[in-house]
């Protein structure tokens, strides 16, 4: 799911091979499980933040929380099939984890710059990127209405827009209006959290 979000946002680095990477993780990770607290988690920067999940550095006593929440195997033995679960924690990851928020911001930027001039065109473009099909008219209308509502909210609360757009290390296009970009980021997050995008049966 993380790789999919990074791919549609244009952030995914597809380079193969190399050492393990350390993407965004909660502060204080490893402090409780390292011997004497002498091993600290040091987050990577640059393109290492956007490598495929299979390259994520794995500490057996403190695996990446976002991967654990989605039932990633412990790597102690081979797993032929992963268990299927659905918990509120998973939604919290896809809605709030910096990697997903940053991916939504970059997907929003793609929708604005590549998706056309109207909100309807941008919604259709974003939907096709994440779901590989056009949205039904009723769904597109709901997403456009959500955009308009969020745009009004962010115009009134510019600090919230700035805070949302500051998530993540990737550079954003500063020529895009902050309120507009933040509103599209919310819509992009909604798209990345669609059931058909995050569930494979």
Question: Where are the language model's segments positioned?
Answer:
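Long, internal low-complexity/basic segments
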Residues: 138-142, 163-166, 176
């Amino acid at each position: 799911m993380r790789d999919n979000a990074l791919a549609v946002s244009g952030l995914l680095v597809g380079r193969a091979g190399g050492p393990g990477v350390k993407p965004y993780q909660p502060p204080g990770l490893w402090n409780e499980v390292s011997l004497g607290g002498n091993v600290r988690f040091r987050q990577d920067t640059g393109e290492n933040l956007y490598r495929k999940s299979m390259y994520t550095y794995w500490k057996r006593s403190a695996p990446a929380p976002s991967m654990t929440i989605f039932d990633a195997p412990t790597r102690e033995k081979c797993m032929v099939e992963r268990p299927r679960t659905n918990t509120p924690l998973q939604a919290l990851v896809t809605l709030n984890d910096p990697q997903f928020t940053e991916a939504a911001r970059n997907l929003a930027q793609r929708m604005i710059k590549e998706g056309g001039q109207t909100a309807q065109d941008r919604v259709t473009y974003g939907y096709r990127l994440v779901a590989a099909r056009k949205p039904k008219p009723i769904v597109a209308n709901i997403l456009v209405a959500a955009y308009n509502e969020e745009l009004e909210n962010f115009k009134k609360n510019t600090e919230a827009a700035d805070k949302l757009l500051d998530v993540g290390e990737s550079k954003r296009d500063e020529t895009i209006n902050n309120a507009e970009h933040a509103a599209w980021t919310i819509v992009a997050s909604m798209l990345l959290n669609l059931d058909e995008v995050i569930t494979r049966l």
